[in-house]
Amino acid sequence: MKAVTVIPGIPESLRLMDVSKPNPNKGQVLLKPIRVGVCGTDKEIIEGRYGKAPEGNQYLILGHEAVAEVVEIGDGVDNAGVGDIVVPTVRRPLNCDLPVDFCPVGHYLEHGIWGLHGHAAEYSVTDAKYLVKVPKEIVDVAVLTEPLSVVEKGIDMAMRIGQARFDWKPRTALVLGAGPVGLLATMVLRLMGLSTVTTATRPPDSLKAKLVKELGGTYVDSAVGQISGEFDIVVEATGSPQVINEGLGHIAPNGVYVLLGVYPSGGSLNNLGELMTSVVLNNKVIVGSVNAGIKHFEMALEHLRRAKDEFNNWPAKLITKRANLSNYQEAYTWTHDDIKTVLEIIQS
């Protein structure tokens, strides 16, 4: 079968290879991927900055964001059947009894990222217990489930932490960044009924700005405009230390700051003492979140369904670039205005 591969640690080793078709072991299923999403983690792996091949392999098959059809089931599988359309979660525990998305570094494997082959191939295998079934009406946008699940977990944590203290009812939100994660965060917050401001460095007539406005949100071009006021929930989705600093100054008293970016080493925060004093004196919370489990994948699918109905098929508009296995390189070539790129494994 054909698969999109890299040799982790070797920059620009991206290749389309012929590899052996996998077989499902006990408790596993064989998948026929339909679509695979491409994200910044793939870019880091291709550049040789991250990633690990499975034990005994030199190469790693990419693809951790996927929607797929079950085509074969292994012994002992009772939660999935042939023909089911599913989304597989990413992580698998490694000597860890915690929920897998809370396992510390070194105690998990990740499809298409760390120690497990991904789904950017004609076939893939995964453990059946980590599958989420996809309703027929959202199969076309289900490839967005994995990045959305990360958002769902972060916002869910914000709500749970906030409401554990008192009857906290957030009304306003600020989203820093309008990439896929920032836009999906805007979508969730608007579905929750929060007045939401989203900011990025694109002009007001850009597609990203239009997508924010279609959700009923307010867009601010941070290259020329200033954000004013404080917000009950602030979501940082840029991965920029400078933007973290800005967000700290916009958390309302009793508010929650959700960090979803992965940040480079180095950098400094201006007025850190003053900002942290404000966090303490105003009972603010800062929480980081990564990955997600079954629950948040299910929440993501429900919000995709609602967004399709309530916002005129809005999720589909995030997919701005499509490629297939014959021109796979295009999927892994990033341009300034791409939002979400999808690799179509099964051509319609």
Swiss-Prot record:
Binding annotation for substrate: 41, 110, 146, 291
GO terms of molecular function: D-glucose binding; glucose 1-dehydrogenase (NAD+) activity; glucose 1-dehydrogenase (NADP+) activity; NAD+ binding; NADP+ binding; zinc ion binding
Keywords: Carbohydrate metabolism, Metal-binding, NAD, NADP, Nucleotide-binding, Oxidoreductase, Zinc
Reaction it catalyzes: D-glucose + NAD(+) = D-glucono-1,5-lactone + NADH + H(+); D-glucose + NADP(+) = D-glucono-1,5-lactone + NADPH + H(+)
Pfam assignment, any one: Glu_dehyd_C
EC number: 1.1.1.47
Superkingdom of the source species: Archaea
GO biological process, one term: non-phosphorylated glucose catabolic process
Residues that, per the record, bind NADP(+): 178-181, 260-262, 289-291
Binding positions (Zn(2+)): 39, 64-65, 146
Cofactors, names only: Zn(2+)
Matching InterPro entries: ADH-like_N (IPR013154), Glc_1-DH_arc (IPR026583), Glu_dehyd_C (IPR031640), GroES-like_sf (IPR011032), NAD(P)-bd_dom_sf (IPR036291)
Primary role: Catalyzes the NAD(P)(+)-dependent oxidation of D-glucose to D-gluconate via gluconolactone. Can utilize both NAD(+) and NADP(+) as electron acceptor. Is involved in the degradation of glucose through a non-phosphorylative variant of the Entner-Doudoroff pathway.
Protein family: Belongs to the zinc-containing alcohol dehydrogenase family. Glucose 1-dehydrogenase subfamily.
Protein name: Glucose 1-dehydrogenase 2
